[in-house]
């Protein structure tokens, strides 16, 4: 009788351990999503930081909040909170090389990818740095964050 209970207990423990361990496919999926987010952020940065962009100096006057220390995927909530102001400033960057439709598509991609990466958790409270960042600094910080997380996964 005790053998059956012991075997059941072992089986349940193995199931719990197996289900709670991260699957390699989820790591691969996270890497792919981070690559996509990196690509989209770089495209935004290139559109903004283009020397031919006559509105760059005006865009640099807008300030964005960045977290004091972003080290985990949950910190992407801080990016989510700044996406709307970012999008509004990006509309200023519209030019013949950086169209409104392209900006909307990139912002939509970023929103979707960030939600996949951070999950639906919204209770995370961002601890922002005292100093604000320009749009270029803001995008560079998030690019660096993605690269850092990506390097820990490889």
UniProtKB/Swiss-Prot annotation:
Gene Ontology biological process terms, A to Z:
activated T cell proliferation; adaptive immune response; cell surface receptor signaling pathway via STAT; extrinsic apoptotic signaling pathway in absence of ligand; interleukin-2-mediated signaling pathway; leukocyte activation involved in immune response; negative regulation of B cell apoptotic process; negative regulation of inflammatory response
In Swiss-Prot or TrEMBL terms, this protein is called: Interleukin-2
Localization, per the record, is: Secreted
Family the UniProt entry places it in: Belongs to the IL-2 family.
Cleavable signal peptide: 1-20
Q: Which PROSITE patterns match?
A: INTERLEUKIN_2 (PS00424)
PANTHER family given in the database record: INTERLEUKIN-2 (PTHR48487:SF1)
Which SUPFAM superfamilies does this entry report, sorted A to Z?
4-helical cytokines
Question: Which species is this UniProt entry from?
Answer: Felis catus (Cat)
Q: What does this protein do?
A: Cytokine produced by activated CD4-positive helper T-cells and to a lesser extend activated CD8-positive T-cells and natural killer (NK) cells that plays pivotal roles in the immune response and tolerance. Binds to a receptor complex composed of either the high-affinity trimeric IL-2R (IL2RA/CD25, IL2RB/CD122 and IL2RG/CD132) or the low-affinity dimeric IL-2R (IL2RB and IL2RG). Interaction with the receptor leads to oligomerization and conformation changes in the IL-2R subunits resulting in downstream signaling starting with phosphorylation of JAK1 and JAK3.
Q: Between which residues do disulfide bridges form?
A: 78-126
Q: Kindly state which keywords UniProt assigns to this record, in alphabetical order.
A: Adaptive immunity, Cytokine, Disulfide bond, Glycoprotein, Growth factor, Immunity, Secreted, Signal
Glyco sites are at 111
Which GO MF term does the entry hold, naming one? interleukin-2 receptor binding
Give the record's GO CC terms.
Answer: extracellular space
